[in-house]
Amino acid sequence: YQLGEKNGTLVAGGNGEGNGLNQLNFPAYLFVDRQQNVYVSDNNNHRVMKWNKGAKEGFVVAGGQGQGNALTQLYCPNGIFVDTLGTLYVADGGNNRVMRWTQRDKKQGTVIVGGNVRGEGANQLSYPAGLSFDREGNLYVGDQNNHRVQRFSIE
């Protein structure tokens, strides 16, 4: 990608709304890693996609098994974060949880926050949206429908 370029460069999707590997349906949040690979929470396809730099199509790195709450599924994924080990964190909005996908287990994720019924308790979320980490590894979650941001200490 060129510094100072005035025109946008297509890096993901751009082939109309759909669920093909070269399409997106309501791309919500993005994460770009150090290699300039682009991760996209493909909200209405209930998946997270990864486009390697220069690729014409992406591949599914989480979800993509239809809307649902199984460990292989997402329901309107929002905020995403990828750490230096390639571990993917997803704010799974419709399921009121945050999930983690490791490089070792790409088939299903692990619930690390929430996953209980939607609510206002300290261990509950209501449509989590954005997420981020601090230098100490604490997870911050924008708990959208509860109008709050929560911090979690995770392993």
Each model region followed by its residue ranges:
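Short loop/turn segments immediately following the C-termini of beta-strands
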Residues: L3, Q35, N43, K53, ...
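Gly/Pro-rich loop segments of beta-rich domains
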Residues: G4-A28, G54-N78, D105-A129
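Structural signal for beta-propeller blades
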Residues: G8, H46-V48, N96-V98, H147-V149
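Residue-level detector of Asp-centered blade-edge/turn motifs that repeat once per structural unit
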Residues: V32-Q35, V82-L85, F133-E136
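Conserved beta-propeller blade signature
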Residues: V38-Y39, L88-Y89, L139-Y140
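Loop/turn-rich, solvent-exposed surfaces of beta-rich toroidal or solenoidal domains
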Residues: L71-D105
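Blade-level signature of beta-propeller repeat domains, shared across WD40, Kelch, NHL, RCC1
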Residues: S126-E155
